[in-house]
Amino acid sequence: MGTRDDEYDYLFKVVLIGDSGVGKSNLLSRFTRNEFNLESKSTIGVEFATRSIQVDGKTIKAQIWDTAGQERYRAITSAYYRGAVGALLVYDIAKHLTYENVERWLKELRDHADSNIVIMLVGNKSDLRHLRAVPTDEARAFAEKNGLSFIETSALDYTNVEAAFQTILTEIYRIVSQKQMSDRRENDMSPSNNVVPIHVPPTTENKPKVQCCQNI
């Protein structure tokens, strides 16, 4: 298989959600283009970028969507979540309010996205450790309680950015491939594929055969 961008085995849509200013756009640009913009302004509307990675010899193309966390853009919610198989729920470790709003974002995600979506809680801007307002253990406990994976990242110095996307994409791939194997097994076990002939021995009597069925 070549390395062209249009050659892939799986295409996974992953959305970035969270308050405005937590660094979603820089996480996107750092992972897909290895770029960081210190003067990055809030995203207006929606944008997405792609990058392909290898998992178990398969090419996974990630289509990562980013939208503004500002309330006035929430009208795009339904289209934004449609088809998403993964979500990074991002907060700023130096701004406790962005962490407090995680619960609301999680509810919105579960209201609009597929029930099987894979969710990772991401504490971004870990380089601001001297300004930390959200303890790591507190966020990790919240993630465990709500069935989310958890990681802290820094788009500025690239800490754990690769790991965050690799982890969620690998988890999605495992779920999808296991489902495909399960579906294949079910198909193999279906009656049409497992027809067992039943041989009825002939009767010794010369009675005429009954051609109809009778309810008892």
Curated annotation (Swiss-Prot):
MF annotations from Gene Ontology: dynein light intermediate chain binding; G protein activity; GTP binding; GTPase activity
Q: Where is this region: Disordered?
A: 183-207
- The source's superkingdom equals Eukaryota
Q: Which residues form the propeptide?
A: 214-216
Q: Any idea which positions bind GTP?
A: 20-26, 37-38, 40, 42-43, 69, 124-125, 127, 155-156
Task: Name positions with the PTM N-acetylglycine.
Answer: G2
Q: Name one GO cellular component term.
A: transport vesicle
E.C. number? 3.6.5.2
Question: What GO biological process terms are annotated to this protein in UniProt?
Answer: exocytosis; melanosome transport; neuron projection development; neurotransmitter receptor transport, endosome to postsynaptic membrane; protein localization to cilium; protein localization to plasma membrane; regulation of cilium assembly; regulation of early endosome to recycling endosome transport
Which positions are lipidated as S-geranylgeranyl cysteine? C212, C213
* Localization annotation: Cell membrane; Endosome membrane; Recycling endosome membrane; Cleavage furrow
Q: Where is this motif: Switch 1?
A: 36-47
**Pfam families (alphabetical):** Ras
Activity-regulation annotation: Regulated by guanine nucleotide exchange factors (GEFs) which promote the exchange of bound GDP for free GTP. Regulated by GTPase activating proteins (GAPs) which increase the GTP hydrolysis activity. Inhibited by GDP dissociation inhibitors (GDIs) which prevent Rab-GDP dissociation.
Q: State the oligomer form and interacting partners.
A: Interacts (GTP-bound form) with RAB11FIPs (via their C-termini) including RAB11FIP1, RAB11FIP2, RAB11FIP3, RAB11FIP4 and RAB11FIP5 effectors. Forms a complex with RAB11FIP3 and dynein intermediate chain DYNC1LI1; the interaction between RAB11A1 and RAB11FIP3 is direct; the complex regulates endocytic trafficking. Interacts with EVI5; EVI5 and RAB11FIP3 may be mutually exclusive and compete for binding RAB11A. Interacts with SGSM1, SGSM2, SGSM3 and VIPAS39. Interacts with EXOC6 in a GTP-dependent manner. Interacts with RAB11FIP5. Interacts with STXBP6. Interacts (GDP-bound form) with ZFYVE27.
Q: Which NCBIfam families match?
A: small_GTP
Q: What is this protein called?
A: Ras-related protein Rab-11A
Native organism is Bos taurus
